[in-house]
Amino acid sequence: MNALHALQTLAVSIRSVRKVYGDPHSGPVALKNIDLDIRDNEFFTLLGPSGCGKTTLLRMIAGFEFPTQGEILLYGENIADRPPFERPVNTVFQHYALFPHMTLAENLAFGLESRPMGQVLSKAQIDERVREMLALVQMERFAARKPNQLSGGQQQRIALARALAPHPKVLLLDEPLSALDLKLRQAMREELKAIQAKTGITFIFVTHDQEEALTLSDRIAVLSEGEVQQVGRPEEIYEQPRNRFVADFIGETNFIPAMVSRVEAGLAWFSGPAGQALPAQPCTTAKVGQQVTLSVRPERLHLRGDASQGALACRIEALIYLGTDLQYQVSLGDGTRLTVRTPNSLEHHPRLSVGSSAGLLFERGSASVLLD
């Protein structure tokens, strides 16, 4: 692939973008030299806690804010200094901002009727596009209704359809599901992903909800304190976190302090805080004698009735019933406490009682070796 073709397959490229409010030398820094590539037709998520800079970055792509330094490329063209109306992007906000005095069809038509000179559509073209968008979000029979006659999920669909109607090259979504209840939010995730696949438009989605990010995304960028911590596919982010922040922010995990005792053929062996041998894990960067932290997801640990056949001896300290799962708190001989999650299946996972002794097994390759 030549350089020109590679550039053309990128929808958005963020190059050394920095955002400082107030004095550029002493003001608060919202973004610190961000570099990101977002591919054409990709569902890309900016994920992080409140204040991490994800919404600021989205607003700069939209043109609502401008970077202190750096470039924002849209299909290879720098748009960092352009106002919003000169950017072929649209935004769906957390609050849908539908016009209450207009019908749904009129809401969708409004943006099409307000196009700049040279891009004006005929009445027939606008009506056809409105019908297409209502069909896309399965709201054709509600065309004559007004927003206050809709549920929250229906309003969200119309806001999405209105943003897609002008054929944007990139659609920006700023936590659009956060106002919905859990069941509706889960249903809308499936619809969002299906609509993105059907339209082929690049979606850039902002959320603090890890489950949303893992469910929807082709790739995720995890942000913290104005910096990108890791970019990757959902399974990479979850199973191979680059640092302690990513491991802790995405899902649940156990952190185990350990020392590298042996490295051989791409595997590393470890000893725990009290010197107990811990299972080997794939690792090519650790060195013998190095202090590291192992991150192990609760579902990658398994309990058995005794500590035979390589299992570590442990004690059941607590049991929490979660419906589909059982969550155990266990302690090792040195006092290290770990969380173990097993399916709620009496046939395959006999329930262990609090206070009893048990054996703890690590899945091979289950631990991420964190060097920070």
Swiss-Prot record:
Keywords: ATP-binding, Cell inner membrane, Cell membrane, Membrane, Nucleotide-binding, Translocase, Transport. It comes from the Bacteria. The keyword Transmembrane does not apply. It is a peripheral membrane protein. ATP binds at G48, P49, S50, G51, C52, G53, K54, T55. Its EC number is 7.6.2.11. It is found in: Cell inner membrane. It catalyses: ATP + H2O + polyamine-[polyamine-binding protein]Side 1 = ADP + phosphate + polyamineSide 2 + [polyamine-binding protein]Side 1. Residues 12-250 form the ABC transporter domain. It holds the Pfam family TOBE_2. The keyword Glycosyltransferase does not apply. InterPro entries: AAA+_ATPase, ABC_SmlMolc_Importer, ABC_transporter-like_ATP-bd, ABC_transporter-like_CS, Mo/tungstate-bd_C_term_dom, P-loop_NTPase, PotA-like, Transp-assoc_OB_typ2. One of its GO terms (molecular function) is ABC-type polyamine transporter activity. GO terms for cellular component: ATP-binding cassette (ABC) transporter complex. PROSITE patterns: ABC_TRANSPORTER_1 (PS00211), ABC_TRANSPORTER_2 (PS50893), POTA (PS51305). The complex is composed of two ATP-binding proteins (PotA), two transmembrane proteins (PotB and PotC) and a solute-binding protein (PotD). Belongs to the ABC transporter superfamily. Spermidine/putrescine importer (TC 3.A.1.11.1) family. Part of the ABC transporter complex PotABCD involved in spermidine/putrescine import. Responsible for energy coupling to the transport system. PANTHER family: SPERMIDINE/PUTRESCINE IMPORT ATP-BINDING PROTEIN POTA (PTHR42781), SPERMIDINE_PUTRESCINE IMPORT ATP-BINDING PROTEIN POTA (PTHR42781:SF4). This is Spermidine/putrescine import ATP-binding protein PotA. It comes from Pseudomonas fluorescens (strain ATCC BAA-477 / NRRL B-23932 / Pf-5). The gene is potA.
